[in-house]
Regions:
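N-terminal Rossmann-like NAD(P)+-binding subdomain of aldehyde/semialdehyde dehydrogenases
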Residues: 1-137, 206
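Rossmann-like NAD(P) dinucleotide-binding subdomain of oxidoreductase/dehydrogenase enzymes
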Residues: 122-256
Length: 256
């Protein structure tokens, strides 16, 4: 993944938008390069369509395969090293020890879900056998288990650039259960988000997962030709669930 400031619809960079924005260092007000293009309604629709198609394949992936996938995401995030930490520091103003700890938490979450997938009990499988001779009516055979819902939209949080953002708990849990993810990156730490997205894309390629199992879009709130990108994403017919961490007003706006 080249950091060109575009959306990433699968492995394909898409730069249809005309509006651009950039992160700003909150400590000194410096505008940080590069410029990033805002997504368009059409790009969001395409991402939803591709995620829906990917779901039909990804939902059938075994627990062991998904565990390997999550483990590789964690490893690729770690391989980003100090470049990731330094950029996050510039974009958020958070101290490096705090950022380093949060990266460790994020990597740990991914590995935790990988271990859970290998163990397997998360599906809560239940088998209630039939009793054909039960009176007054026979009892049917009833079996159940947890299954994936479909594509999930995840919104990055401003104050947790790793643990509640691109590869945070919402993304990790969705990918673990078999749901493709479309991340709406937080504009305050957009390049940090894009770097983490590149780690996920590398893991997808390494594992030969469907390329549209993860997609990454971005925009500044309320600037998408007066259409809120978040609402466009949430209202897309492909989206089955939403992971959001943020203000009450922001959450209510998406819910309503």
């Amino acid at each position: 993944m080249n950091l060109q400031g575009n959306q990433y619809i699968g492995f394909t960079p898409s730069g249809a938008g005309q509006q651009v924005f950039q992160a700003i260092n909150p400590v000194n007000g410096e505008k940080l390069m590069p410029l990033f293009k805002e997504a368009t309604v059409e790009e969001i629709a395409l991402a939803g369509e591709k995620a829906s198609n990917a779901f039909q394949l990804y939902r059938l992936t075994s627990g062991a395969e998904k565990a390997h996938f999550l483990t590789l995401i964690a490893e690729h995030i770690e391989k980003l090293g100090d470049d990731l930490l330094q950029r996050c520091h510039l974009e958020t103003g958070l101290p490096l020890p705090r950022i380093t700890g949060e990266r460790g938490r994020t990597v740990g979450q991914l590995k935790l879900f990988a271990a859970l997938l290998k163990e397997g009990s998360w599906v809560n499988a239940s088998i209630d056998l039939a009793q054909s001779d039960r009176q007054p009516l026979p009892k049917p055979d009833i079996r159940s288990m947890q299954i994936a819902l479909g594509p999930v939209a995840v919104f990055g949080a401003s104050n947790f650039p790793f643990a509640y953002s691109t590869a945070g708990g919402d993304t990790a849990s969705a990918l673990a259960v078999g749901c493709p993810v479309i991340v709406k990156a937080h504009p305050a730490h957009i390049k940090t988000s894009t770097l983490v997205a590149s780690a996920i894309q590398k893991a997808i390629a390494d594992c030969k997962m469907p390329q549209y199992v993860f997609q990454h879009v971005s925009a500044v709130e309320h600037s998408l030709n007066e259409i809120d990108l978040g609402k466009v994403l949430v209202q897309d017919e492909a989206i089955a669930a939403v992971g959001f961490t943020g203000s009450r007003n922001g959450g209510r706006a998406l819910l309503d």
